[in-house]
Amino acid sequence: MPYQAPVSEYQFIFDKVVPLAQVVEKERFSEAAPDITDAVLKECGKMCESVMAPLQRPGDLHPAYLENGVVRTPPGFAEGYAAIAESGWIGISAGTQYGGMDLPFALNAAMHDLMCGACISLNLCPLLSQGQIEALEHHASDELQKLYLPKLISGQWTGTMNLTEPHAGSDVGALTTKAEPQGDKTYKTVSYTHLTLPTML
């Protein structure tokens, strides 16, 4: 059975369970009127069904691999990621100053749920970028925000997940990476660290 995005369920949730109407009363989210919310959910749902879901099985059958020092993604993943980026979904909750839509994070969470249901392996890329965008918006200097946010929000650059070492796997407690202060700098002793989704384009 083909994937069907649960758009109507989220419309119900945002109307009856967690009313976005209360959020829209805030000046920051005044643009997130119900018609905008519905349009975002419907358009994201269409993309999930037509672009992302068809990539789930090919991604399982033809996983990423290393070829001559270059990681090759499953067939269609680069095009799928480009469709996500071109639709503006990566910056849905990011500030408008650097190209985001500045819509409520609840809508962002719903969108990522739809996208994960369609093809979680592809959606990890914009989902990881969302984490970096949020961290930069809240904690980075203006200079760093100007450098990174436009490229992350547009999808030109992607966020990564840097969690493990070859001997540790999912046992984060077995990591041996250390950072020790060396005067004004930090010196790291590390074995190879695995990166998740460093680039899709």
What does each of the following model-derived ranges do?
Residues 193-199:
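Conserved small/polar residues in nucleotide/adenosyl-binding loops
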Residues 128-129, 140-185:
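Internal maturation/activation junctions in enzymes
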Residues 185-189, 201:
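Short, intrinsically disordered, charge-balanced linker/junction segments flanking boundaries
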Residues 1-123, 147:
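Amphipathic, small/basic residue-rich leader segments at the start of a protein or domain
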Residues 98-102, 131-135, 143-144, 167-171, ...:
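Flexible loop/turn segments at secondary-structure boundaries
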Residues 70-82, 93, 162-181, 195:
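Flexible, glycine/threonine-enriched loop-and-boundary segments that flank and lead into catalytic domains
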Residues 91-96, 118-134, 155-165:
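Core alpha/beta catalytic barrel or barrel-like domain that forms the active/cofactor pocket
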